[in-house]
Amino acid sequence: MKIKVKVGLEWHQRLCSRKLFCHCPSNLNLDPEYWITRKLRISSSELGELDPAAAVEAARSRIFNYGFNRSSACLVELDEAPPFPLNEEALMIVLKMALYFKMMVVDEVRVMRKTVIDGSNTSGFQRTALVALGTPESYIETSEGKVSLKTLCLEEESAFIVEKGGSEVSYKLDRLAIPLVELATAPEIRSPEQAEELAEEVGLMMRLTGDVQRGLG
C-alpha cells in the first residue's frame, strides 16, 4: 500500500568556526575538569505571561549538573557573563549559503531567544537568528519534483546530555553554543524516497562549501 505523506525537512549542521557568542573554540569530547549544579526557574516574558511548556518543565523541579573544560567553555557558557557580539565569521558562512541557495537575505539580522528550561542551555533559552528567506528561485530539484527552501537561520547548539535520571540530569558544555546553520524546506515532499534524495543532496551541497563539520551530532 502506498502511503501518502506531506513532509518538510530541517537541517542543523555545525559550522567550522569558534563558538557563536564567545571566543572559545569548538572543541568536542574533552573530559570535564569541573562540575557545577543548577536549578532553572521559570519567569514571565516581556508581556507578563508564562510559557505553558516551560511551566510544565519547571514543575518537575529537576537538578541540572554541568561538566566543562576550560579549553572549550567559559563564563558565557556558564551563564555567568553576558554573551559577546555575534560571531561574524559564522554569520558570513551562512550569508554565503544564502547566496548559494538563491535565498533573500533579511535587511537586519536579529538574535531571538526561545525559552528552553529542560537544562540543555544554562541560560534557560536558545538563541537563533533568521538570516534569509526563500524566493521563487530557492528550491532543490529532485526526481519527484522541486522542493522549496523556506528559511535559513544561524543558531547555537545545545549542551550534550551525559546522564538522565528521574530528578537529575547531567550535561557537558563543550557542545553548547557551537554555531549551527539551520535550513528548512516547505512541506512539499511527497514520499520517503524523495525525502532521502533531498537530504542527501542538501547534505552534499553543504559539505561542498567547505565550511561545515562532518559526522553525526
Residue ranges with predicted function:
Residues 1-217:
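Basic, nucleic-acid-interacting segments
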